[in-house]
């Protein structure tokens, strides 16, 4: 018979394993239910976020100033940040993504996958409402990006699956779609959103055209966080060089946002609910050009992008399987009360969790 303290410890370990497997606590990925302001060391507002801020979150401003949240006042919905320096020092060289373009297989191999976790997001100017359960405006923006990519010879797959309601479990619901899209071996996996801050924060002019800025969002609680961040920073660097003002900033927040599934997974926020939808749709054309340059050198698929497919997916799957096995082991110990019985039960569980990947244990 297992001692009470052992059962409690085992339950705690099982809960931890499941949290790591299926994502951070739901509250860490609840967006749009509040408006937090980030205050810099000089007391001036740096940015706002339609969602909570947490100690440890990071922010890369449009001018590449790099900040980390040092304290949070949830009652006032404010956070204070410390200045860390310039974020440009460790940006990967542009050629790291595009130098293999000459040796690429051709246009037929270029593929970018997209979906929209917050399936109701819409634009007041254009949709007449900020939230639509059918025909949401965010899908018009995603379609614009898809068309712009395809115009450049890049195949784009945009899932129209919906994951309503817009709540803390939306990312859990969209995870299956993200996993299905990854089976096609895309060079990037993009979650298309819009923000919910005042419109003036996203208004910009690029090449004489009034369009919306785009925020890049990285989840910092996953094993691919460093690569997700590097990908976001490279996109910003390329955009800043060719289309200054297009990328608003990069927010690195608590949560995983399904980005643990792939190093080139990224969340993009096209404008805000108060900005004209047309401006967000027009921004998509510029983003498509930036993605083409970063991933394919503007003309062909980069070796760096190609190489990330198999290995990255395998690492992500292996990480998930390992955690699933850990959860199964703890559960077996709890339910059987002994190591010997638990071992036999674990063998059966591993086979079930992995789909027979490691074979069935003989009973």
Positions of predicted regions on the chain:
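Bacterial N-terminal signal peptides
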Residues: 12-21
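Sec-dependent signal peptide cleavage junction
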Residues: 22-30
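Short, basic/aromatic beta-hairpin or loop at an interaction surface
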Residues: 29-43
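Non-catalytic propeptide/linker segments at domain boundaries
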Residues: 49, 56-117, 122-125
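Catalytic-core regions of hydrolytic enzymes
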Residues: 125-201
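Membrane-proximal low-complexity regions enriched in glycine and acidic/polar residues
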Residues: 176-183, 187-266, 274
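Active-site-adjacent mobile loop/cap segments within catalytic or ligand-binding domains
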Residues: 249-305
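C-terminal single-pass membrane-anchor helix
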Residues: 304-363
